[in-house]
Amino acid sequence: KGLTFEEACILPEAFFTIWFNLFIKNKIKKKQKILIHGGSSGIGTTAIQITKNFGLEVFTTTRSKNKSIKCKKLGADHSINVKNVDFEKLVKNKTKNEGVDVILDIVGGDYVQKNINLLKRNGILINLGWLTGSIVKINLLMVMLKRLTITGSTLRTGSLKEKEKIAKELKK
């Protein structure tokens, strides 16, 4: 209610993308900590609501104070304006240097190594976009020592059968 036709049309893609990546492909668990980059984006706002309702502690990044406020209203526990603060340092501080279990990244570029730094042992980095670059240099030794999983996906390449499976899972 209150959405334009165009706005309503994009909802399934955001929900399907989040559900598939968090719960079907990566089996995210309650009480984990998640960092969602681009918290005020379509993917970000959807991810905040789903993960908060699922019982995760939610960190987000944005590029303005107003967007951070919006993310908090949607359920984010912590919203970081990256124009004013180094998200890596703040998340480390808020988690007492433990880091987070899962990161949803639509930014890419120089965020990727920072994400690797922030992930706990056996953490999962899910790449859903590359606003600042798709080609990156990372420390593979850190990936190996922390036993990290780096993954990503797009619905566009999925078959109709895969999308039907996601829809059925979401309906439950």
Question: At which residue positions do the language-model features occur?
Answer:
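Mid-domain Rossmann-like dinucleotide-binding core that forms the NAD(H)/NADP(H) cofactor-binding site
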Residues: 8-85
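Terminal peptide-recognition signature
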Residues: 18, 51, 71, 101-103, ...
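N-terminal Rossmann-like NAD(P) cofactor-binding module of classical short-chain dehydrogenase/reductase
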Residues: 35, 80, 101-104, 126
